[in-house]
Amino acid sequence: LERATTYQSWFDDILPGADIVLYDGSEPLYLDLQNGRVDLIMTNPMKAHLKFLSKENGAGFEFKGPVVDEEKYFGIGVGIGLRQGEDELKGRLNGALKTLINSGELETYARKIFPFKLHKGEWGQ
């Protein structure tokens, strides 16, 4: 696990006493996994995909297990930063996202880029 992350907080609360190794960044985490010094890692799926799994050194590794996304630790999702007072733009963005989600197009587009669902579920679905 990366030190001082929400994943460390989750482990401390949910799996107290678990034998974990803490890292000061993601690169050493991926190196130890690749070289067999750890059996698994837990990190942000987007980061894992972009920095490791989609690269040559990430070949042979994959997402496993259930999605860990308790709101208490990980919030309600990602967001888009806007300047205060951009209410019209916020409304347009929310409307567009709602349309894409309801039609299934967001998931279709995301599947072209990421090997995991953007919404709750098991990896690889």
Which residues does each PLM region occupy?
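Proline/Glycine/Serine-rich low-complexity intrinsically disordered segments
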Residues: 1-125
